[in-house]
């Protein structure tokens, strides 16, 4: 009798994210203390944010505006029950001076939203948002002798961050992979940066992720035991934590171990999660309404006014760039990642430059300069007007792509008018056909062996001839005119010499063998699209190897 092995169980991850968005207000949520990052410890504090007896909190109106804008952008319903209130979340920790946190519990500011994400190679997916609520941040502990509490000799507390305004955005458990988790977090970051409600600087803690993950057999409806992962301060950390924790929990199930509901810490050094404490439940925090703050009530007219302030969000821009401007999904994604870059690109297009050409220039030459100098696009001297003028000079045939490439370093350093710089240096492109024909004739006359080889089948030598002409004109020749002239002249058959007297004894010699040509480097006029990232590069002066006398007559 034969036995059949049980089929191998396939597991899937069930993931939800809690994202803490630090709102870019000048002052804290309930007091007038500064929120500036990096100040001397314990200087941005007052009796209110340090929980001194007799003080009363006052809600920051700007923080409320930012929270409602964010909720509107995430398609949330603003306090569907008609009002929203604050609650005290009770817990004891050294960086929480009041021994409670002012947060929101049963009546959050907004609920039931969604965010659409795009993962390469997969259809767009909608991730549900359970709730968005406001709360104050805690202080910060600095552990001496180690980078965390374990192993430290003592801890110092900095209350500068205590009381800073936060929005906590809780997703539905709709995420299934590490790539989806990173896409969700990335899109959320883009939205809050577009709105101007958060700078999104993860290295400063402006955007922090808590990951909730469980595993279950694929297709099963019941959830597994949830584990929370903290200390995720980058998209890479988020992805690696998902991958590690998924594998760890699957290993536990396969080995018969029980998964414990707990909070774990992501350790960047060891690339694994470490158990911190058992996971708290809501009743552990003993929530009750905050007696010192009145409920928030917004009417429909006010909520509509917030929605009208949203403007075009990243997903809407990407769709417009693809459908209206004809850009690829990749180009649309790169250009809309930051609002300033998208606005720069749109200004270049508005000045008459074709969208594809502008996209290639911004995502190519401009982006390379930004990466090299670590500047934002608003800080560079090549303004949209300068970019449009430079690209227009190329399109008008006044300069070549090669000349444009040579001008860029000076323009990035000093700014100014590209047209004036061209005139000052005498770099106007030579497009006169008669003038270029004379130069082409000189080049071909000096390369008779290579001409013979070209006519014998080595047509890839065309790039070599183009390079020679470009060298003679210091890169100023119009590559298209040069290509046309060369192809025309090389196609002409040379004038046959007068016939020699016949000799019965002579036998015609076999034609010389011509070895295969090396691969030809692309030339500017053949392959470069006007204004493309590839086009704004110098053409090779001699793209193919010239033919020596021995090569031609071997």
From Swiss-Prot:
GO annotation, biological process: glutaminyl-tRNAGln biosynthesis via transamidation; translation
Ranges of compositional bias, category Low complexity: 502-540
SMART domains: GatB_Yqey
SUPFAM superfamilies: GatB/YqeY motif, Glutamine synthetase/guanido kinase
EC number annotated for this UniProt entry: 6.3.5.-
GO molecular function annotation: asparaginyl-tRNA synthase (glutamine-hydrolyzing) activity; ATP binding; glutaminyl-tRNA synthase (glutamine-hydrolyzing) activity
Subunit relationships: Heterotrimer of A, B and C subunits.
Name this polypeptide is given: Aspartyl/glutamyl-tRNA(Asn/Gln) amidotransferase subunit B
Organism (species): Gloeobacter violaceus (strain ATCC 29082 / PCC 7421)
